[in-house]
Amino acid sequence: MTEIAKNTNFNKASKAKNDEFYTQLSDIERELKHYKKHFKDKVVYCNCDDPRVSNFFHFFSYNFEKFGLKKLIATCYKNQSMDLFSQNKSEQAIYLVYEGDKNGNMVPDPAEIGIRELKGDGDFRSKECIELLKQADIVVTNPPFSLFREYVAQLLEYDKKFLIIGNGNSITYKEIFKNIQDNKIWLGVTKPQLFLIDNKENFAKYCSWIFR
């Protein structure tokens, strides 16, 4: 696929309702290694992920002790299929809580991960998800691009530290760009390469990590 075609498809996807993108574990590892000291004794919240298949939850649960985390929380829309993310497509949303290794094998076993049902659909804007957000010190995830402005506005409203992924256009949004100009938000070190969930086609001509 040409670069022009990639960019065109990416822009179309970011405007569509189905704008869920898959984040590679390797991209998470490459970026997160630069922030290790900032996670010590912190509660991390991943609120746009399916923790059963999310590489964000995988990374933080397997590096819980290495990063010195206090708690890991992840919310999601429950999926019809275990290998796909979904949005408002299922009858029950869940959230997971992991507080570290208990049996000494340094692996996040199922018995060590608390699985709890949400009353609503798992939307990050819902009251119960906001209550979980209030517990968090740092939010790390890949939010839907179509809701990026609203998503960042919420994080700023609740004065949260965050490390999230946005598409190339997101840094030009006036709300985002103003915060970058004012040194309230910064661009990350690496460039993630995202894949559209539905067909795994590469749309990542340009994406950025954004943090506060």
Tell me the role of every PLM-derived stretch.
Residues 1-212:
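Class I S-adenosyl-L-methionine-dependent methyltransferase catalytic core
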